[in-house]
């Protein structure tokens, strides 16, 4: 052993004179070998250059001794730990330290079944005319043996695919084990080109706060050994789901053959599509589990109900439902319509309550074919409202009943409208008639006023004739005509007495008649002759008094 140490010291002294700037790159099978100056060597020995070799666990690696090829001198390999450890030599008297170590051509060291503990510094000693030392750095890489991906998704499909609810928070984590620690990267592929998300050593985690539809795709985590370049990756598909925004809508439609009805359950706006279940109500008899359900003729009954239950993967757990009810059309009664000869008229028919929607037709008679649109008949329909416009009305052709018929596969209803066609109105005749009626009414009012209020008309007449306002006038209401006929004889007697008094009055002096007049008005008051006589007597007394006064005044001296 003392002799070996002497040889090592001599070799170190000779190696100091070599070139220090040489770099060597070798690429043996499954190993990379490079040479770097001034690296670690045996204690107390400064080499000219150092090579770096890389191998993987369980693989084989070859470490070359310098850059020379061909025949070599005595070559010996050492492992540089705290103290140099002999591995193998051309000297046959020195057996290898382990069967895994052997020498190849040109003094290269072959190590089989690499282990992690093989990582370290190695030195090749060549003794020919002089001794040379060639240090080699061996790096042993391991893994990555696995890649573990964890995604905190909402749920997992039976095939293992993950899904997350739109708007939720999703955490991503990827880890791997390797020697040295691997470089971990995240990629996402939503379309054709992957997008890089980030990288880190050993593990990589990130969080997406609000999942959206454009974040649905394949997420890939890759772990790469920075020494060996070995890479492992795991790709996980993540789907983004969302439920329909509103409740399902049930409807009934006529089939393409127009012979039966189809139930439709629409619950759109979600992803993926929901599932459906149709039941017959009441009773809950299951009919089918498709979006469209065909009804049999026996099920086309008035008031029949059917229920659709929709289920989405994101809930609600009990599902969302809607109910559809079959019903025949309803038609309100229509009033009579009138059209003038040569004019136009529009008949309107409003249908309500029909499910499915009804087909509306216009007929002149329920046994005749439906009215077809033409220049004479204009038919317009908007939704469940239909209008029939008749142009150039004719009394012979168009007057009569018109039927509005509404029909669906549940039932049929009809209502009739009577159309009366008349001649146009004479406006001039109407105006003349109105004016005549107004004049007639005015005459009647005037006559009634004259009959019941004669004083008003008498005073008016006297004023227009310029009579003296000092005239004496006595008005006595008259009795009804029937009583006048019965008391006609009594009136004649009274008239004779009045005439006598009048004659006496005419004998008064002429001066009296110059300033005053006495008007005689005789009437029968309620057939009471005594009352009338008393009134007349009072009138006579007043007249006598006036006459006496006048005579006295005339007797005065002038």
Curated annotation (Swiss-Prot):
Return the GO cellular component terms, semicolon-separated.
membrane; neuron projection
Q: Name one Pfam family in it.
A: Ig_3
Does Transmembrane helix appear among the keywords?
A: yes
Q: Which residues are glycosylated?
A: 32, 60, 121, 150, 159, 218, 344
Keyword Isomerase among UniProt keywords: no
So which stretches are on the Cytoplasmic side?
Answer: 448-558
Q: Where is the protein found, in the record's own terms?
A: Membrane
What is the designated name of this protein?
V-set and immunoglobulin domain-containing protein 10
The gene behind this protein is Vsig10
């Amino acid at each position: 052993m003392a002799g070996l140490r002497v040889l090592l010291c001599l070799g170190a002294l000779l190696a100091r004179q070599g070139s220090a700037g040489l770099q060597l790159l070798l690429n043996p099978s499954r190993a990379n070998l490079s040479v770097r100056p001034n690296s670690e060597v045996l204690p107390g020995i400064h080499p000219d250059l150092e090579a770096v070799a890389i191998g993987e666990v369980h693989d084989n690696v070859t470490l070359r001794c310098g850059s020379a090829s061909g025949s070599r001198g005595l070559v010996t390999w050492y492992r540089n730990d705290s103290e140099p450890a002999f591995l193998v030599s051309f000297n046959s008297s020195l057996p290898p330290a382990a069967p895994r170590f052997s020498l190849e051509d040109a003094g290269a060291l072959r190590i089989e079944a690499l282990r992690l503990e093989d990582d370290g510094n190695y030195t090749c000693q060549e003794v020919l005319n002089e001794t040379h030392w060639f240090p080699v750095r061996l790096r042993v890489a391991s893994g990555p043996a696995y890649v573990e991906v964890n995604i905190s998704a909402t749920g997992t499909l039976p095939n293992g695919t993950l899904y997350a609810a739109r708007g939720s928070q999703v955490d991503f984590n990827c880890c791997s084990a390797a020697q040295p620690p691997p470089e971990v990267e995240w990629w996402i592929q939503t379309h054709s080109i992957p997008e890089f998300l980030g990288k880190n050593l050993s593990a990589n985690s990130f969080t997406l706060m609000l999942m959206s539809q454009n974040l649905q795709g394949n997420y890939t985590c890759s772990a790469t050994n920075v020494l060996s370049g070995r890479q492992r990756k795991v790709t996980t598909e993540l789907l983004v789901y969302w439920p329909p925004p509103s409740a399902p809508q049930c409807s009934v439609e006529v089939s393409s053959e127009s012979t039966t009805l189809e139930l439709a359950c629409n619950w759109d706006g979600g992803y993926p599509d929901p599932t459906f279940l149709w039941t017959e109500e009441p009773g809950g008899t299951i009919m089918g589990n498709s979006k469209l359900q065909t009804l049999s003729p026996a099920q086309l009954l008035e008031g029949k109900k059917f229920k659709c239950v929709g289920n989405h993967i994101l809930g609600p757990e009990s599902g969302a439902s809607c109910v559809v009810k079959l019903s025949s059309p309803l038609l309100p009664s229509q009033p009579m319509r009138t059209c003038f000869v040569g004019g136009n008229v529009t008949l309107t028919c409003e249908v309500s309550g029909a499910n499915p929607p009804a087909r509306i037709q216009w007929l002149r008679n329920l046994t005749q074919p439906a009215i077809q649109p033409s220049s004479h008949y204009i038919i317009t329909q908007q939704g469940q409202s239909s209008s029939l416009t008749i142009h150039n009305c004719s009394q012979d052709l168009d007057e009569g009943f018109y039927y509005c018929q509404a029909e669906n596969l549940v039932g049929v209803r009809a209502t009739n409208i009577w159309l009366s066609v008349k001649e146009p109105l004479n406006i001039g005749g109407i105006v003349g008639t109105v004016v005549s009626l107004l004049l007639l009414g005015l005459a009647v009012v005037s006559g009634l006023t004259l009959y019941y209020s004669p004083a008003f008309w008498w005073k008016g007449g006297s004023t227009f004739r310029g009579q003296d306002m000092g005239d004496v006038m006595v008005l006595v209401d008259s009795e009804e005509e029937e009583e006048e006929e019965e008391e006609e004889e009594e009136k004649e007697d009274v008239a004779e007495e009045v005439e006598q008094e009048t004659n006496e009055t005419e004998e008064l002096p002429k001066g009296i008649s110059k300033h005053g007049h006495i008007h005689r008005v005789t009437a029968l008051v309620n057939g009471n002759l005594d009352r009338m006589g008393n009134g007349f007597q009072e009138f006579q007394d007043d007249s006598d008094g006036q006459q006496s006064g006048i005579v006295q005044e005339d007797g005065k001296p002038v």
